[in-house]
């Protein structure tokens, strides 16, 4: 029987009406971000969101709003580690401190990524007659983009990732915190002159082989993984217990040219995916991810509209009930 934690990401630094709506429809679990905003007029906390005092206030705010904080999905500064720059030891120290504080606070999962330079990217957000306001990517839109100001190569990125894992996995093991690597988004080979290395099924096999700890795992973002494979349910079964966190979303197109869609309107058989999660007895965290913006929605973050996220939560619950029946 499927018994995962259906969570929702809370971007806001204060409770708002959407948080109330989530509780009204039965969502109890939350995914948070690092608390980068000031907590009060003294402006103490912004530069150190990985510190215990910043995190405990943030967790208490989420708990007081009726949610359980299951995961943090956010990278602290780690560019010096990714590019092997002077000062990388300080970044490692801060990340280790963050993981220790997650353990103290009962935050069981950290979703991070290895997108060196620029993180996830969309090249358009526009109105679409079928889905409303949609976001997507076309590789032709970036062909004249300036290269990132730091240079590296694929081999170095893998070596730097191994250094990171060798230093952080022991801290995660000691503090019972799962590390869940998010794929490159989009999963193309190169972005602004920087190679992407977490962009295929084979790259995830290599990630898990770099450090075989059971705490070294995956954020299976379906919108990215479905651009890497024609059989996402088989990939779910392949990675099995190393999947700690799922982003349940879909797209149409391919990795070089895609658009994000309503659930049920994309390229993936979502019911078969849910059956695959049942087959592996998935007990982790699942959340809605990038969605279109429907008419009259006042959400301000492209891909994270309120109305379609509520629709998607209902869709996931319906699929889960169908599989469980």
Predicted regions and their residues:
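Histidine-acidic metal/acid-base catalytic patches
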Residues: 1-5, 12-14, 19-21, 26, ...
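Basic, amphipathic N-terminal segments that precede the first structured/catalytic domain
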Residues: 21-39
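Structural motif corresponding to the early beta-alpha repeats
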Residues: 33-162, 166, 173-174, 224
